[in-house]
A protein has these predicted regions:
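C-terminal scaffold of the Radical SAM
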Residues: 3-4, 67, 90-114, 120-413, ...
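Short alpha-helical scaffolding segments that buttress acidic/His motifs in well-ordered protein cores
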Residues: 84, 388-390, 452
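Short, amphipathic alpha-helical interaction segments positioned at domain boundaries
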Residues: 444-473
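Minor-groove-contacting beta-hairpin "wing" of winged helix-turn-helix DNA-binding domains
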Residues: 438-442
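Short amphipathic alpha-helical interaction segments
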Residues: 411-425
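A short, conserved structural fragment
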Residues: 427-437
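Local cysteine-cluster metal-coordination motifs and their immediate loop/turn environment
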Residues: 72-88
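Flexible, acidic/Gly-rich N-terminal and inter-domain linker regions that tether
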Residues: 1-68
Length: 473
């Protein structure tokens, strides 16, 4: 059995994570990423504008007075990347963004009366699509809208997703002046053959220029995204990509497994599955990446995220206040999330809500004077309990049953009798250690945390979902 101890400088359990490839290969291969619980496939159209406004009003009454986060979805892309599963619109017509910004402003005008004042923003994220599809004047216009309704604060976390192929050094400097202090840079792979196969041609030079500009502009953190499992990738090619990425010295790095779901994401039908690496090759690639990143000093945060030891994510992991939200691991995730733009997903109190996914339907709702809520979900007490448990597993890698008994008034061992029986099987496999009043995820279990969290997912246990998920490792 090939078990590799990972050289990690920061760990909540003071034990080095272990990459046990035989164990990884033996367990169920797909499952939720748990950026929310319940997962988005549980959202339903019985939750609409009225339910969303009710949740906002409860927040304003002080019942759910959490810090506030804002997500803005910019759906436009110049070209299509075949692997992509995001909600996007492919166009080169910048005037479409002018019309879209008008509707963002309409949405904020409709939202404002229900926000209860001009709140401070703990967190801001521009996602897409490609947020930097917007030109400098359009970005300025969106930021003017943000400042009209919210207050930016010195220690806020304000991030934007960047496509280095379509942004200049001057635009990056402009983003810094506007107030952005964190950047996520899409790379995926530097190998030309892989890039051609997924229709994303991106040079090292243009990527470096953007990252250098971010540092010049004073960005606190630069994160890069990679994907393994793409066509023509192999262990040798990924070595070159990792070495090239490390020369850019990013503060954070996300290493995602490519989820091939062509029945859901039509662009993926253009990917030649005959040249996609097999399971063993993908495990080889993952193992190499994990070993190399940790040997170079990056801390394994969880799932597919790595960060430098002095990065806020690593500090949050070490000190036990790491959180998880729709953007992944975060230090500010325990916020109420207001989300605007087509298809965007928000979280207010014990509710989730999603805007219309079709841009014409999004525009039509706003033209009619309605918030464009397409669907959502009201969590019940069991959902809230399980959401907290899954959050603790994903971010702290341990559970203390007594906390849940105190907060929720339940006898934990009886309430979760079936789940704890399943945990005994995972203990036999070496993924968890069970104790009288809790459990701890083992070094082997750190890489399989999604499999462990799935045990507490009511909807999966009762087969109430037909969703197709990405692989857990």
């Amino acid at each position: 059995m090939k078990i590799i101890p990972i050289s990690n400088n920061t760990n909540t359990n003071n034990e080095l994570p272990e990459f046990d490839r035989e164990l990884i290969a033996s367990l169920p291969s797909s499952g939720p990423r748990y950026t929310s619980y319940p997962t988005a496939d549980r959202f339903h159209e019985g939750f609409k504008e009225a339910e969303y406004i009710q949740a906002l009003n409860l927040r304003n009454m002080g019942a759910l007075n959490k810090p506030l986060s804002l997500y803005i979805h910019i759906p436009f892309c110049n070209t299509i990347c075949y692997y992509c599963g995001c909600n996007k619109i492919i166009t080169k017509d910048k005037s479409r963004a002018d019309a879209y910004i008008q509707y963002l402003e309409k949405e904020m005008e409709l939202l404002a009366p229900h926000l209860g004042g001009r709140h401070q923003l703990a967190q801001l994220h521009f996602g897409g699509g490609t947020p930097t599809f917007l030109n400098d004047d359009q970005l300025e216009r969106v930021f003017d809208m943000i400042r009209k309704y919210f207050q930016l604060i010195p220690n806020g976390e304000y991030s934007i997703e960047i496509d280095p192929r379509k942004v200049s050094r001057e635009t990056v400097l402009k983003l810094g002046k506007l107030g952005f202090n964190r950047m996520s840079v899409g790379i995926q792979d530097f190998d030309p053959k892989v890039q051609e196969a997924v229709n994303r041609i991106q040079s090292y030079e243009e990527t470096k220029e953007v990252i250098d500009a971010a540092r010049e502009a004073g960005f606190k953190s630069v994160s890069v995204d990679l994907i393994y499992g793409l066509p023509h990738q192999n262990t040798e090619s990924i070595k070159t990509t990792i070495d090239t990425v490390l020369s850019l010295d990013p503060d954070r790095l996300a290493l995602y497994h490519y989820a091939h779901l062509p029945h859901i994401f039509k662009p993926q039908r253009r990917i030649d599955t005959n040249v996609v690496p097999g399971s063993e090759e993908k495990l080889d690639m993952l193992q190499y990446c994990v070993q190399t990143l940790t040997e170079r000093g990056y801390v394994f945060i969880g799932m597919d995220h790595f960060a430098k030891p002095d990065d806020e994510l690593s500090i949050a992991l070490k000190e036990g206040f790491l959180q998880r939200n729709f953007q992944g691991y975060s230090t500010y995730a325990d916020c109420d999330l207001v989300a605007i733009g087509v298809s965007s997903i928000g979280k207010i109190g014990s509710t989730y809500s999603q805007n219309e996914r079709d841009i014409d339907a999004y525009y039509a709702a706003l033209d009619a004077g309605h918030l464009p809520i397409m669907r959502g979900y009201q969590l019940n007490q069991d959902d809230i309990l399980r959401r907290n448990i899954i959050q603790d597993l994903m971010c702290r890698f341990s559970l203390d049953y007594r906390i849940y008994e105190s907060v929720f008034g339940i006898p934990f061992s009886r309430y979760f009798a079936a789940e704890l029986e399943d945990m005994k099987q995972l203990e036999t496999l070496g993924l968890v250690r069970l104790k009288p009043h809790g459990l701890t995820v083992t070094p082997k279990g750190r890489f399989l945390i999604r499999n462990i969290a799935m045990v507490f997912d009511y909807h999966l246990r009762h087969k109430e979902t037909k969703a197709k998920y990405s692989q857990t490792v």
